[in-house]
């Protein structure tokens, strides 16, 4: 998600258009008995005891690691109790808030730039000029823009996945969007709402998507290998296959794929995830705004169901980058595909269904550069922020937790039909077919008493029928394609913009960042126990910011520590706020050393289980500080208690009380600021090497709010008078120790 993003002609945030008008209320530490590499990658793995696996790939999807747990053996006499592990302790002094155009880390740490917008990832590609004149034909072999969620996959000498590797790996990262001002000589060339320079649009096609790059540690320094055979870009022109219940249905038929079996590209890839067989999941978030659909001319050609779906997903604009306006079109429709209006005689003559081909979780095999990515439709279509893998247990289903990143949207989970078999480690896309194409999709209802229920999204249950008043569901494909409408019907709880998800490997608790909301989406009379605050976060210039502009983090524990359970308990782990705010706003008692706003990226370390990293994507507190990264040591659901807070709408002389459940205040021992980024950036995406001694962090869109290409407000990372660039930094501890401890 991008807080400081561009707006349309009406001042509407292109990445933050709420469309929910429903009446709904609002693998642990390195295992001692690790499999041998021989077993891990294909011989005898089915008889394994345990094997370390990545979960939630880096930043909400992150490299939190869980063991594969075998079926329980017969009871045996209880052994003598093991010594209690030494509690984790944050081992750095908090970094002060900052408005400087630099990356600030604690004393004793070094942050080095690793991978910047435009950097070449193939032999023979010239260094990036960063002046808008690089050959557009080379951009499919360059780093994309707006670096986001990422995962580190360790690689062994046999070029296979080795989660413990600390010196060589594949860094796989999303490129969410673009800052077009800095991509061309003088920004985008637009004449009366029409893009007139096709080469500019070609650049932009390639700068979205995903990078796969090989990285290596040489001495104490990390670098990426420009000519690695693993290096790959996946972008808006990459062919993708559909799998799952929506594949090869009428909903996905287009001129490009007349049988609905494939499409091109992925974009607005925000958070991410991983699988226990060693593939990467990238998640399509704010995709709807890229499509052109003019309501005044297209609505009359659509059915009532289509109009309901368009309204719920926000497909009604000229297209945020105006890609559909380029003429002439290419023979294969590279520009025309972004026009989702009815033009031809049937769906196979145009791209009227083009919008349905986005909004999915996409699986990519980083170890096979020639493999075709797959859009896994069983996980539902919405504004996917991430897909965080839950605890992995042999003989049990796999579970992924997901947020829908828009105001008043929902939290979901997918439970596979097939039970996990460790023999599938290294199984690539075929393993994905087995576990991700058939399962149960659920949405969360948070009740006012601190409990909750998972509601299944399935035709014929939970009001998801052909008789639902807002939308007549027809079949299983209709349900997953219109998952938001299905969740409305089921009665899910509207949340304050669900973002990244992360699972604590020590407790199994699931954390979800709710980055913020405004007064229009969450007025004082519409708060709930799980979204309890309404307040005015006044800036230092006394500007009012109403609603819940600072956000919070909710967490829940599935019943009986079973991710497949249909009930859970919840509380609010952390309320973001200025340290100077009132007690009814600063409910987590934050201080100058750990106050924050708009939590977004989130990831649990696998090298130090229980260590949580939090990243911000903020526009509310940027009068005081740039966005930041914090380290935390959270407890567990229920470590605090019930609380009654007082919300105030001073402008309308309204005061209301709201019950909620607040986690234990973290204090500076349990939460402190670790890094502050450069001007106008977002901190997003995080991963670590197999030993936890290198931390990879993404700095997205520094200087995005610049008004002029010749006078940017940031020059990071290259300095001088250069244009700013999104980039990955690698952080190491000068004494070689674990990061953060």
Model regions and ranges:
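Conserved small-residue
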Residues: 22-30, 43, 50-53, 57-58, ...
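Short, low-complexity, disordered segments immediately C-terminal to signal peptides
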Residues: 61-78
């Amino acid at each position: 998600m991008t807080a400081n993003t561009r707006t349309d002609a009406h001042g509407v945030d292109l990445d933050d258009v709420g469309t929910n008008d429903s009446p709904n209320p609002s693998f642990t530490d390195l295992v001692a008995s690790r499999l041998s590499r021989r077993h891990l990658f294909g011989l005898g793995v089915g008889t394994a005891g345990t094997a370390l696996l990545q979960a939630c790939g880096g930043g909400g999807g992150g490299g939190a690691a869980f063991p594969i747990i075998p079926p329980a053996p017969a009871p045996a006499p209880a052994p003598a109790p093991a010594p209690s592990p030494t509690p984790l302790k944050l081992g750095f002094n908090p970094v002060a808030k900052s408005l400087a155009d630099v990356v600030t880390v604690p004393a004793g740490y070094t942050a080095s730039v690793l991978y910047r917008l435009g950097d070449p990832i193939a032999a023979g590609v010239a260094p990036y000029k960063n002046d808008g004149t690089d050959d557009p034909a080379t951009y499919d072999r360059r780093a994309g823009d707006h670096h986001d969620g990422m995962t580190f996959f360790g690689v062994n000498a046999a070029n296979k996945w080795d989660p413990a590797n600390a010196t060589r790996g594949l860094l796989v990262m999303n490129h969410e969007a673009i800052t077009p001002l800095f991509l061309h000589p003088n920004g985008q060339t637009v004449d009366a709402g029409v893009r007139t320079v096709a080469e500019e649009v070609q650049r932009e096609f390639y700068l979205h998507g995903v990078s796969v790059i090989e990285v290596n540690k040489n001495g104490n320094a990390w670098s990426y290998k420009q000519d690695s055979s693993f290096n790959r870009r996946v972008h808006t022109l990459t062919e993708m296959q559909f799998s799952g219940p929506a594949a090869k249905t009428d909903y996905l038929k287009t001129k490009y794929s007349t049988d609905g079996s494939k499409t091109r590209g992925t974009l607005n890839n925000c958070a991410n995830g991983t699988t226990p067989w060693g593939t990467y999941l990238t998640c399509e978030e704010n995709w709807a705004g890229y499509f052109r659909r003019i309501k005044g001319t297209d609505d009359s050609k659509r059915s009532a169901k289509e109009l309901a779906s368009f309204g719920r997903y926000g497909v009604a604009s000229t297209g945020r980058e105006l890609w559909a306006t380029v003429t002439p079109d290419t023979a294969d429709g590279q520009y025309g595909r972004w026009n989702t209006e009815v033009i031809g005689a049937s769906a196979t003559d145009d791209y009227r269904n083009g919008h349905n081909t986005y909004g999915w979780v996409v699986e990519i095999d980083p170890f096979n550069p020639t493999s075709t990515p797959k859009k896994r439709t069983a996980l539902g279509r919405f504004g996917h922020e991430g897909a965080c893998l839950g605890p992995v247990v042999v003989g049990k289903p796999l579970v992924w937790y997901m947020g829908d990143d828009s105001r008043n949207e929902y939290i979901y989970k997918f439970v596979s039909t097939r039970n996990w078999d460790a023999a599938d480690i290294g199984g690539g896309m075929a393993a994905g077919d087995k576990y991700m194409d058939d399962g149960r999709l659920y949405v969360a209802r948070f009740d006012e008493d601190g409990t909750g229920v998972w509601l299944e999204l399935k035709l014929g249950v939970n009001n998801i029928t052909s008789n639902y008043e807002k939308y007549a569901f027809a079949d299983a494909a209709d349900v997953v394609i219109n998952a938001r409408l299905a969740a409305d019907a089921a009665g899910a709880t509207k949340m304050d913009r669900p973002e990244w998800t992360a699972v604590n490997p020590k407790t199994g608790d699931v954390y979800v960042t709710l980055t913020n909301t405004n007064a229009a989406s969450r007025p004082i009379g519409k708060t709930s126990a799980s979204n309890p605050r309404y307040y005015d976060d006044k800036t230092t210039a006394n500007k009012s910011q109403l609603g819940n502009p600072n956000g919070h983090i909710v967490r829940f524990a599935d019943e009986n520590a079973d991710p497949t359970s249909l009930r859970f308990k919840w509380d609010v782990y952390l309320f973001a706020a200025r340290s100077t705010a009132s007690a009814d706003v600063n409910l987590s008692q934050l201080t100058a050393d750990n106050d924050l706003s708009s939590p977004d990226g989130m990831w649990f370390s696998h090298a130090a289980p229980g260590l949580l990293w939090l990243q911000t994507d903020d526009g509310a507190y940027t009068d005081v500080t740039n966005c930041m990264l914090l380290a935390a040591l959270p407890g567990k659901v229920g470590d605090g208690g019930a609380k009654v807070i007082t919300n105030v709408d001073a402008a309308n002389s309204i005061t209301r009380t709201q019950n909620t459940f607040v986690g234990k205040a973290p204090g500076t021992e349990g939460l402190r600021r670790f890094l502050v980024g450069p001007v106008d950036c977002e901190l997003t995406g995080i991963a670590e090497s197999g030993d936890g001694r290198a931390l990879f962090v993404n700095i997205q869109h520094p200087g995005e709010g610049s008004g002029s290409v010749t006078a940017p407000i940031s020059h990071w990372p290259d300095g001088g008078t250069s244009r700013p660039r999104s980039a990955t930094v690698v952080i190491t501890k000068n004494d070689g120790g674990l990061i953060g401890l």
